[in-house]
């Protein structure tokens, strides 16, 4: 008896291409989905679809092109731009995973008879929780922590126990269709940002307006090139008169286009409040480790959930925590929930 149908989110990259091969090799009926999330005119989609076409021919599978550009624009792109214009630091990949990949794409897969949706993410799931991947340098559990818990039972991550370098080596030997993919450059971290984030924001607002740099007492100590060019913890791109040691951005004030700077100790954070929780456990008070940005070291903390907010008390200080980023709660390698950072002190 043949195994169930799995749809694979295919990007034209090596991870999703090997994922499709692995699942077919295990006996699943495999079909692909390519997400068209924006209307780039630089050949981006054409290149990706060329790679997917070659892989689909090798595997003898069909694939769909799912145009979610409008939904992506409203729910991810606009949020990204608005965040920088309101002085917070966005995480578009987290939004995309919840709303687009494991929201709309999962709905599409189920409507087309798939029992599962697989992707080339480096993470693990048992249908109830996410866990860190074995390759900690590529682990993407942080970005998945806002996905609706009802979606987990449909999700598969075949690469969860592999190292990225092994997937690349494996793909290069598999077929010429895969070898071509391994020879192209890695895709950029945020698919719609071709160079730097400010190039995207500049399309929607004049962010190149000089403003005052303030010290922690509100005194003008220098100039900057426009608040949207800065994020919390940044130490370059502004002047501080008479400074003998590095100064860091500690606060952004969009209303009057000022930024506040201070020495490293001014970035110290001991408490965090988070909103828009996505919890995989029911406890309202617990100890765990928290990651306050991707690729950061996790920090031991106490968490209390009250009035739909997470009150996080860190057991050791963390420096440079930005509003708008995600606090992800871990128990060892298991993701037990997450919350968007609203305030710090």
Curated annotation (Swiss-Prot):
<feature type="active site" description="Cysteine persulfide intermediate">
    <location>
        <position position="191"/>
    </location>
</feature>
<keyword id="KW-0547">Nucleotide-binding</keyword>
<dbReference type="InterPro" id="IPR023382">
    <property type="entry name" value="MnmA-like_central_sf"/>
</dbReference>
<dbReference type="GO" id="GO:0005737">
    <property type="term" value="C:cytoplasm"/>
</dbReference>
<keyword id="KW-0963">Cytoplasm</keyword>
<protein>
    <recommendedName>
        <fullName>tRNA-specific 2-thiouridylase MnmA 1</fullName>
        <ecNumber>2.8.1.13</ecNumber>
    </recommendedName>
</protein>
<feature type="binding site">
    <location>
        <position position="120"/>
    </location>
    <ligand>
        <name>ATP</name>
    </ligand>
</feature>
<dbReference type="Pfam" id="PF03054">
    <property type="entry name" value="tRNA_Me_trans"/>
</dbReference>
<feature type="site" description="Interaction with tRNA">
    <location>
        <position position="325"/>
    </location>
</feature>
<keyword id="KW-0820">tRNA-binding</keyword>
<keyword id="KW-0808">Transferase</keyword>
<feature type="site" description="Interaction with tRNA">
    <location>
        <position position="121"/>
    </location>
</feature>
<dbReference type="GO" id="GO:0002143">
    <property type="term" value="P:tRNA wobble position uridine thiolation"/>
</dbReference>
<dbReference type="GO" id="GO:0103016">
    <property type="term" value="F:tRNA-uridine 2-sulfurtransferase activity"/>
</dbReference>
<dbReference type="InterPro" id="IPR046884">
    <property type="entry name" value="MnmA-like_central"/>
</dbReference>
<feature type="binding site">
    <location>
        <begin position="9"/>
        <end position="16"/>
    </location>
    <ligand>
        <name>ATP</name>
    </ligand>
</feature>
<feature type="region of interest" description="Interaction with tRNA">
    <location>
        <begin position="293"/>
        <end position="294"/>
    </location>
</feature>
<keyword id="KW-0067">ATP-binding</keyword>
<dbReference type="Pfam" id="PF20259">
    <property type="entry name" value="tRNA_Me_trans_M"/>
</dbReference>
<feature type="region of interest" description="Interaction with tRNA">
    <location>
        <begin position="138"/>
        <end position="140"/>
    </location>
</feature>
<comment type="similarity">
    <text>Belongs to the MnmA/TRMU family.</text>
</comment>
<comment type="function">
    <text>Catalyzes the 2-thiolation of uridine at the wobble position (U34) of tRNA, leading to the formation of s(2)U34.</text>
</comment>
<dbReference type="Pfam" id="PF20258">
    <property type="entry name" value="tRNA_Me_trans_C"/>
</dbReference>
<feature type="disulfide bond" description="Alternate">
    <location>
        <begin position="96"/>
        <end position="191"/>
    </location>
</feature>
<dbReference type="InterPro" id="IPR046885">
    <property type="entry name" value="MnmA-like_C"/>
</dbReference>
<feature type="binding site">
    <location>
        <position position="35"/>
    </location>
    <ligand>
        <name>ATP</name>
    </ligand>
</feature>
<keyword id="KW-0694">RNA-binding</keyword>
<keyword id="KW-0819">tRNA processing</keyword>
<dbReference type="InterPro" id="IPR004506">
    <property type="entry name" value="MnmA-like"/>
</dbReference>
<dbReference type="InterPro" id="IPR014729">
    <property type="entry name" value="Rossmann-like_a/b/a_fold"/>
</dbReference>
<dbReference type="GO" id="GO:0005524">
    <property type="term" value="F:ATP binding"/>
</dbReference>
<keyword id="KW-1015">Disulfide bond</keyword>
<dbReference type="GO" id="GO:0000049">
    <property type="term" value="F:tRNA binding"/>
</dbReference>
<feature type="active site" description="Nucleophile">
    <location>
        <position position="96"/>
    </location>
</feature>
């Amino acid at each position: 008896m043949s195994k169930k149908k799995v749809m694979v989110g295919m990007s034209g990259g090596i991870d999703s291409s090997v994922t499709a091969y692995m699942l077919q090799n295990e006996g699943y009926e495999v079909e692909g989905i390519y997400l068209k999330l924006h209307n780039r005119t630089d050949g981006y989609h054409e290149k990706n679809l060329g790679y997917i076409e070659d892989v689909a021919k090798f595997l003898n599978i069909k694939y769909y092109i799912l145009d979610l550009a409008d939904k992506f624009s409203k729910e991810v792109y606009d949020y990204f731009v608005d965040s920088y214009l309101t002085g917070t630091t966005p995480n578009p990949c987290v939004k995309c995973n919840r709303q687009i990949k494991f929201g709309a794409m999962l709905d599409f897969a189920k409507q087309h008879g798939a029992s599962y949706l697989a992707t080339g993410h480096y993470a693990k799931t048992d249908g109830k929780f996410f866990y860190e991947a074995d390759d900690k340098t590529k682990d993407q559990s942080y970005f998945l922590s806002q996905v609706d818990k009802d979606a987990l039972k449909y999700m598969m991550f075949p690469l969860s126990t592999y190292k990225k370098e092994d997937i690349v080596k494996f793909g290069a030997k598999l077929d010429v269709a895969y070898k071509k993919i391994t020879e192209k450059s890695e895709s950029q971290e945020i698919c719609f940002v071709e160079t730097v984030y400010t190039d995207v924001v500049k399309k929607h607002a004049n962010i190149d307006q000089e403003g005052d740099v303030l010290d922690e007492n509100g005194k003008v100590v220098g100039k900057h090139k426009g608040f949207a060019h800065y994020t919390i913890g940044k130490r370059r791109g502004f002047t501080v008169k008479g400074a003998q040691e590095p100064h860091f951005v500690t606060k952004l004030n969009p209303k009057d286009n000022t930024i506040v700077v201070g020495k490293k100790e001014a970035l110290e954070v001991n408490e965090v409040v988070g909103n828009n929780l996505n919890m995989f456990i029911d406890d309202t008070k617990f100890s765990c480790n928290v990651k306050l940005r991707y690729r950061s070291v996790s920090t031991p903390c106490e968490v209390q959930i009250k009035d739909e907010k997470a009150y996080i008390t860190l057991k050791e200080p963390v420096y440079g925590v930005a509003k708008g980023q995600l606090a992800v709660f871990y128990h060892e390698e298991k993701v037990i929930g997450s919350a968007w950072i609203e305030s710090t002190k």
